[in-house]
């Protein structure tokens, strides 16, 4: 096909909670059931979209979550809200939870890929990036970050494997030189 996918990384998102997880939160259903105060991300952010999808999967809406309307600007700000006691939990990444001495309850793994035109795969910049992503140094560094891991880093992947729902076929146009019946 015209486009190619390059593997990059895997990242885990979950509930950022106080050390020891005093409310025993293991799911968004637990957050709703306990009335835990939630630090949210802004409407339109990737984490907010993910949260709304996860809530729907559990048969919940934002109305079930105390503090759903409280927006924080970043994963770090969510963690800080938990540290300060302004919130009991929020959805975010493990790395910021660990950096603030908090605990983390994993909920979902996200896959990150880079997309490019097939024609750019052998251009010097793309080749250099792919070579870097394939190095043990890069993969070890990524694996050293809490909640991150290499996932096919630097490998060219078939779009049909990464995005099985995508239909890359286009209907054929009638040829202009064909005779009409």
Regions found by a protein language model. Give the residues of each.
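Short beta-strand-to-loop elements that line the ligand-binding cleft
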Residues: 61-74
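N-terminal hydrophobic or amphipathic helices and topogenic motifs
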Residues: 1-2, 23-29, 136-181
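Short loop->beta-strand "edge-of-pocket" segments that line small-molecule binding or catalytic clefts
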Residues: 29-49
């Amino acid at each position: 096909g015209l486009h190619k996918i390059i593997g990059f990384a895997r990242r885990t998102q979950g509930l950022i909670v106080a050390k020891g997880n005093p409310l025993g939160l293991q799911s968004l259903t637990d957050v709703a059931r306990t009335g835990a105060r939630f630090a949210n991300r802004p409407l339109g952010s990737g984490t907010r979209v993910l949260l709304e999808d996860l809530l729907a999967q559990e048969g919940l809406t934002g109305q079930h979550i105390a503090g759903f309307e409280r927006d924080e600007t970043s994963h770090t700000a969510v963690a800080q809200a938990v540290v300060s006691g302004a919130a009991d939990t929020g959805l975010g990444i493990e790395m910021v939870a660990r950096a603030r001495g908090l605990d983390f309850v994993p909920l979902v793994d996200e896959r990150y890929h880079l997309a490019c035109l097939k024609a750019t795969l052998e251009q010097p910049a793309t080749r250099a990036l792919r070579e870097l992503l394939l190095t043990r140094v890069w993969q070890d560094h990524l694996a050293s970050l809490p909640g991150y891991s290499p996932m096919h880093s630097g490998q060219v992947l078939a779009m049909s494997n990464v995005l099985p729902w995508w239909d890359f076929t286009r209907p054929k146009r009638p040829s202009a030189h064909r005779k009409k019946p």
